[in-house]
Amino acid sequence: MEPSAEDGGATSSSRAEKGEPPRDPVEQARAICLRLLTGTPRTRRQLADALRKREIPEEAAEEVLSRFEEVGLINDGAFAQAWVESRHHGRGLARRALARELRTKGVEAALIDVAVSQLDTEQEEETARDLVARKLRATRGLDRDKRLRRLAGMLARKGYSEGMALRVVRQALEEEGEDTEHLGDEGF
């Protein structure tokens, strides 16, 4: 095919094949979003922030993001569900910590509520018990109060409520033969 005046003298190969960035803002936005989505799922806000950072015009960004939502390349609800599943089972995070992480990623409150509701209290408490059981041996040799503070603090950092953290840690210490009768309820 002969280069024509209409396409600026270029051959039929695309800019992407030549490694040139697209000149049209919509093409640029599309290329940026596809590249970002290739590595890992992203929320709409994460992609919008990336486009804004690269100075893509708002109209072009909105057009591409809306189209990607239409075809299912961006789905904040599915992202939130997968995030909760992964982070709860992988890191043992509680609903509160998961909701906080999703908020920072720009997921809407209603979608966060749906995603974290898949974890029930029993499941959350079982995960807390597993986390404490894994860390319990490392605290042997420390005095009882210090063990309680360390283990309950670890759970608190993972988003567990103070009440659940203290209950789970006390139970684990009792099962190990520690006297927890005189431990106060005033927190850690």
From Swiss-Prot:
GO cellular component, one term: cytoplasm
GO biological process, alphabetically ordered: regulation of DNA repair
Annotated region (Disordered), positions in chain: 1-28
Annotated coiled-coil segments of the chain: none
Compartments it resides in: Cytoplasm
InterPro entries hit by this protein: RecX_HTH_1st (IPR053926), RecX_HTH_2nd (IPR053924), RecX_HTH_3rd (IPR053925), Regulatory_RecX (IPR003783), WH-like_DNA-bd_sf (IPR036388)
Biased composition (Basic and acidic residues): 15-27
Keywords recorded for this protein, A-Z: Cytoplasm
Principal location listed in the UniProt entry: cytoplasm
Pfam family, one: RecX_HTH1
Gene3D superfamilies: Winged helix-like DNA-binding domain superfamily/Winged helix DNA-binding domain (1.10.10.10)
Superkingdom of the source species: Bacteria
This protein's record includes keyword Cytoplasm: yes
Family per similarity comment: Belongs to the RecX family.
Function: Modulates RecA activity.
Protein name: Regulatory protein RecX
Native source species: Streptomyces lividans
UniProt gene name: recX
